[in-house]
Amino acid sequence: MKKTIAGGVWPVMITPFTEDNRIDYDAVLRIIEWYDKNGVDGIFAVCQSSEMFELSPQERVELAKFIITNTPKHMGVIASGHCAEKVEDQIREAQTVIDAGVDAYVFISNQFAKENESEDVAKKNIEYLLDHIDGDMFGVYECPAPYKRLLSPELLKWCAETEKFAFLKDTCCDLDQLEAKCKAVEGTGLKIFNANAATLLRSMEMGCAGYSGVMANFHPDLYVWLCKNYKEQPEKAQELMNFLGAASMVECQVYPVNSKYHMNLVGVPMTLQSRRQDYKLLTGSKKLEIEEFCAITETFRKSFFGK
């Protein structure tokens, strides 16, 4: 495996399904190609956006392997699927994905301890997982479900000092916390990726390495530009950030169904099937909102890039 992962944009990959509710691997390939076309740095596979809690253990592993195998070599792949109840099953699934060649296996932070348990318990359980999984690069995702466990700067620093952690998908959505976390891992190999669009620019100025969030399933190219150019073109970056922050409110709609509808609009065909929620919740008016969102994004894109 690589010893580090690239900064930049890592979309949280959605999972397309066939009409009879199987994983649509042809559509998975089309999504990978679309990510590549839009210049992202890597893919975060088998995460909450992938509906990992609704996938069987076998599906989680097979999906991860397929994405690892079919992603172009210039793009990275990290993957989770860390949602088995028994720790023995967690270890076995993680090892299978690592052995398939993933760049980093990503743990779910709420799996480290129960909601009422302390961070000391979480730390001991992290140590146990590291001792029983043969891998040299890991990540952590502060997944909101089934409950959100945010890592303290102190625990994050400890993770960095193990020299085995390269990735944190941070979901605190709070600039003060992000600044403290960035300071805690400064000079280490652990990179923090913000999942929150509105705070992204400020967080990168504080030291975050990039974006790993929902909106990279709508207009990843804009996030790629921001991550690559915010230092050299700060005024233009702020203009873009104003649009991205406002546009990110679309994730409060019927996600991930709305992203699947949007993918169809931009030439990546798939069904709207979802195991997380009824796709019919994306009503006619909500579809129209996504169509208008797509149109205004294109208008902004042409204005911003002068095309």
Segments predicted by a language model, with ranges:
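A generic alpha-helix structural signal
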Residues: I32, A64, A94, C182, ...
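Short secondary-structure transition/capping segments
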Residues: L55-P57, E117-D120, A180-K181, E205, ...
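Short secondary-structure capping/turn micro-motifs that flank functional sites
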Residues: E51-M52, A113-K114, D176, L201, ...
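Catalytic alpha/beta core domains of metabolic enzymes, predominantly
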Residues: Y128-D136, C143-Y255
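C-terminal alpha-helical cap/extension of soluble enzyme domains
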Residues: G8-I14, N38, C208, M215-K307
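General structural feature for long, well-ordered alpha-helical segments within catalytic domains
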Residues: D24-A27, I31, E59, L63, ...
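Active-site beta->alpha loop and helix N-cap motifs at the rims of alpha/beta catalytic domains
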Residues: K2-L150
